[in-house]
A protein has these predicted regions:
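Catalytic cores of nucleotide-sugar-dependent glycosyltransferases that transfer UDP/GDP/TDP-activated
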Residues: 1-197
Length: 197
């Protein structure tokens, strides 16, 4: 942290070296599939794919084209924005990730239809081929995850009940930064207005 913290943009030139080092470290025991996140992870996965043929998924999370638009980037401020955020490298990495990914993971149809259809991504993937996308909405599949409490669950429940009371409804865990676009207020509102919850 502090003055020793490096922004991720400063690490971009080292991603090919990271991939080479990773392949050397794991030689002979490579995975069958890679999951990648954000532009830098997608780029590293694409480099790995080109060297090994190992397919990968790409989850963009926060795409550069939307950030570029949100920040109001124009021809007048492009140089300062580029120097700070390295948009040209990020957008190129996202386009490469989209092109070579076996699957692109999104959480909503809107994300697929609007964010990935941004003009800066048009030639990176076939906008009409929705089979490349996998929509995985936020939440937990209760058919997969056990509802039978373990001993550690019971201990934790006692601690949480002491703090929050014993209403007995389902717990919702939110793990994200406090950002308006994460719609945490909408989650709290939906939870508080539903009598079953």
């Amino acid at each position: 942290g502090g003055d020793l913290f490096l922004t991720k943009e400063k690490l971009w030139p080292h991603l090919p070296e990271l991939v080479d080092g990773m392949l050397q470290f794991y030689r002979g025991v490579l995975p069958d599939f890679i999951t990648s996140h954000y532009a830098d992870g997608g780029y590293a996965a694409a480099l790995t794919f080109k060297k090994t043929g190992i397919p990968f998924s790409f989850t963009g999370h926060s795409l550069g084209a939307q950030k570029l638009d949100k920040l109001g980037t124009t021809t007048d401020n492009w140089l300062s924005m580029e120097n700070r955020f390295k948009f040209s490298k990020r957008l190129a990495a996202e386009r490469i990730s989209m092109k070579y990914a076996a699957k692109i993971m999104v959480s909503t149809k809107q994300e697929m239809d609007e964010q990935y259809a941004h003009p800066l991504y048009i030639s990176a993937l076939d906008q009409f081929d929705k089979t490349k996308f996998e929509i995985i909405p936020p939440g937990v599949n209760e058919n997969i995850f056990s509802q039978t409490p373990a001993l550690t669950d019971k201990t934790l429940k006692q601690k949480l009940d002491a703090i929050f009371g014993t209403k007995g409804g389902p717990v919702i865990l939110v793990s994200s930064r406090l950002d308006e676009k994460k719609n945490i207020i909408g989650l709290v509102q939906a939870y508080s207005e539903d009598n079953a919850l």
